[in-house]
Amino acid sequence: LAKDADRVLVCFEQAEELLGGGDKIILTGAPVRGEILAADRVKAREKFGLTDDDQMVVSFWGSMGAKYMNEHMAGELALECKNGVSYHHVHATGAAAREWLPRMAKEQGADFDAHPNIEVTEYIYDMADRMAAADLIVCRAGAATLGELCMLGRPALLVPSPYVAENHQEKNARALEKEGGCRVLLEKDANPQVLYDEIQNLLSDRDR
């Protein structure tokens, strides 16, 4: 469509290059929700009872979830329980996985009652505050999400969806990774242990 458009608005400089440049291409950045703009990290962490030493991971794959990645996340959450991690982790399953993901995690050894710092929910209704308070966000790499991550200045582990036109999520993620804002993990390389190890490594790097 870009070749026939009078104006093309893009979120990333790399998109300008991919579209061949020219006067009709305008770098605007991604629109960001008002609640993201208003989010305050200090107030958000106070809201969730987090001290300066506490760490929180927020993970989600979109409102409907992603079955393949939710299966891996079930195993990752089980590893967190078995290893007794001290950080807080809130994972949004999406509607489709709300019933089976906790059950799958428990089958792999997760005990959520014994580890209240690990929370599984269908949907995160206060996402702006959760993201602002987080020390690490694990998610897909849609343009809107990346715009919010950049606005909040939160580090991320991005797993781009491979089921999108022209693999644009990986291109989005690589642009942010090049600037040091995230770590990219391809879906084909993901499994519960890899997810767990990546989360531990990123949380241990407090300067990132």
Spans of model-derived segments:
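Nucleotide-activated sugar donor-binding and catalytic core shared by glycosyltransferases
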Residues: 1-208
